[in-house]
Amino acid sequence: MKLSTKLCWCGIKGRLRPQKQQQLHNTNLQMTELKKQKTAEQKTRPQNVGIKGIQIYIPTQCVNQSELEKFDGVSQGKYTIGLGQTNMSFVNDREDIYSMSLTVLSKLIKSYNIDTNKIGRLEVGTETLIDKSKSVKSVLMQLFGENTDVEGIDTLNACYGGTNALFNSLNWIESNAWDGRDAIVVCGDIAIYDKGAARPTGGAGTVAMWIGPDAPIVFDSVRASYMEHAYDFYKPDFTSEYPYVDGHFSLTCYVKALDQVYKSYSKKAISKGLVSDPAGSDALNVLKYFDYNVFHVPTCKLVTKSYGRLLYNDFRANPQLFPEVDAELATRDYDESLTDKNIEKTFVNVAKPFHKERVAQSLIVPTNTGNMYTASVYAAFASLLNYVGSDDLQGKRVGLFSYGSGLAASLYSCKIVGDVQHIIKELDITNKLAKRITETPKDYEAAIELRENAHLKKNFKPQGSIEHLQSGVYYLTNIDDKFRRSYDVKK
């Protein structure tokens, strides 16, 4: 009989053969080394991941909404009171999403003295498409010198793309693929509409965020999303910059998405033991959990209504929270409640004193710029920082609601854990708003017409003025016969 060479035991004492003893010893050493490596990795995992810096680009031209009301022949207050808008930013054919993204990113890099070699991810959120193949991110790589090892591309879903780019960046830093470098998120759009009721809800602007560990603004581990197929707002016509919009349906989609992400976020936060006194199993009690709330801002009036809607969610879970309100409203059919004007009006009034202290500061930029689409919620967040101030924000939690038609929505939150005065200084929002040129409605219409004429053109030189542009702003100079775009920087 042949003895197997694989036998590892011999003798009555069951001793291991020397070869097997050595193999076992080596295995133990390897396991010990792996444990050491794992312990070391745990010690070096990034902590306090969040926003280290923010920059915002607000175009230097705007139109006053009161003047636009007169120009459009609508009733006084339709745009200013009905929509809650004061001014609307716009650009002519000299600026596009490439130039506006280059402008805000270059300003972020310069204002925070960022070493671009230490950036390992750059992602862009936008719905303002110039090319169906080439990404905005690839254009921005011109600012990174010899650093070509940079992950990330563009992400698209209406106004939600900036948030998805942010989540991707946070996930990358917290993953095993992280190489120790920081990330940058760029988001923004040019929001314009065809003539009609939606035109005053436009706007323009870009935001860039520097993301990394040891940040003064740290994102919480809880977030919730709601995704659904809906034709509330979409852009199927590539021959035009204008969207197709089902206005009333889109408002309902926004409110429904807010309800759903609030319920999901509440359940997750409660299950993690983060909520001390919830309103119910799926309502965490907004007024006790969040110190401030920031929203995607199609219009400021919608945000005012939406904050009241959050309180209504708590009321449905526990009517005793607001004993002054008729308890019968808590039992209304849910679908009917989405468009119930009595509920809406009641909770706008209930929320009014809290809105003044916790939301209004975030709306100063949006009411003066209009909708920046993907940058909207982050422009509102920048507004909150600027008009509340670093001292009053210390230790405070901010809830953020991001919405993109089609639809995609998320509720997430961050906490201010360090001094943000330097961020407020670099944002320089008050001066940026003050230095703008307020154009006439005719000037606004002329700028939109220039954009219409420039759309999809090649062998084209833009006709718009650059006199209003400030130093450091990128602008379009030429589109050649192969649609390749050239830019310059205003001196």
Curated annotation (Swiss-Prot):
Catalytic activity as recorded in UniProt: acetoacetyl-CoA + acetyl-CoA + H2O = (3S)-3-hydroxy-3-methylglutaryl-CoA + CoA + H(+)
Keywords, in A-Z order: Lipid biosynthesis, Lipid metabolism, Phosphoprotein, Steroid biosynthesis, Steroid metabolism, Sterol biosynthesis, Sterol metabolism, Transferase
Biological process, per Gene Ontology: acetyl-CoA metabolic process; ergosterol biosynthetic process; farnesyl diphosphate biosynthetic process, mevalonate pathway
Lipid metabolism recorded as keyword: yes
GO CC, any one term: mitochondrion
Gene3D superfamilies named among the record's database cross-references: 3.40.47.10
Protein role: Hydroxymethylglutaryl-CoA synthase; part of the first module of ergosterol biosynthesis pathway that includes the early steps of the pathway, conserved across all eukaryotes, and which results in the formation of mevalonate from acetyl-coenzyme A (acetyl-CoA). ERG13 condenses acetyl-CoA with acetoacetyl-CoA to form hydroxymethylglutaryl-CoA (HMG-CoA). The first module starts with the action of the cytosolic acetyl-CoA acetyltransferase ERG10 that catalyzes the formation of acetoacetyl-CoA.
PANTHER family for the chain: 3-HYDROXY-3-METHYLGLUTARYL COENZYME A SYNTHASE, HYDROXYMETHYLGLUTARYL-COA SYNTHASE
Name of this chain's protein: Hydroxymethylglutaryl-CoA synthase
Species in which this protein is naturally found: Saccharomyces cerevisiae (strain ATCC 204508 / S288c)
Record gene name: ERG13
